[in-house]
């Protein structure tokens, strides 16, 4: 099984000083969806409630209209594939219409394997005060974030 969290060690800048922190972080992992024995796609997701996520995805994409159409939904032994069997045959859509998120919520696992996400072991080469000011500026400019408390966003600075 894939754990939904992992321990990390990082440097945190707070109150004008650096400190080393041990903490837990949420994991995102590639999890494939197999429908009636055929691999359909791979999600990037936090690996919890995967059977429900898979069935919900099929409902959201209008593949199924009712839970009674699902004969079985089972997480594989390693936790990286959800196998859903429907009580009827279905064809895999050519595209996904309703899934939101970056890249439609889907990913190419081989692309992920090429990404280097390791931490830089060297001291930071940026001014933490500047980063704090930029984050504050970002939050000030995000009206929807202030209203809801959560929005994916990005910033570019020199």
Annotated model-derived regions:
Residues 1-157:
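Intrinsically disordered, low-complexity regions enriched in acidic/Ser/Thr/Pro/Gln residues
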């Amino acid at each position: 099984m894939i754990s939904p969290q992992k321990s990390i060690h990082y440097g945190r800048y707070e109150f004008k000083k650096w400190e080393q922190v041990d903490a837990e972080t949420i994991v995102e992992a590639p999890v494939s969806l197999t429908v009636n024995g055929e691999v359909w796609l791979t999600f990037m997701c936090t690996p919890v409630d995967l059977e429900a996520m898979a069935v919900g995805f099929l409902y959201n994409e209008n593949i199924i209209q009712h839970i009674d159409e699902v004969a079985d939904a089972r997480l594989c032994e390693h936790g990286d594939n959800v196998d859903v069997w429907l009580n009827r045959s279905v064809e895999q859509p050519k595209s996904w219409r309703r899934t939101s998120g970056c890249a439609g919520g889907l990913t190419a696992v081989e692309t992920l394997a090429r990404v280097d996400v390791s931490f830089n072991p060297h001291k930071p080469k940026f001014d933490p005060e500047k980063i704090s000011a930029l984050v504050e500026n970002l939050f000030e400019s995000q009206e929807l974030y202030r209203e809801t408390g959560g929005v994916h966003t990005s910033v570019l600075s020199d």
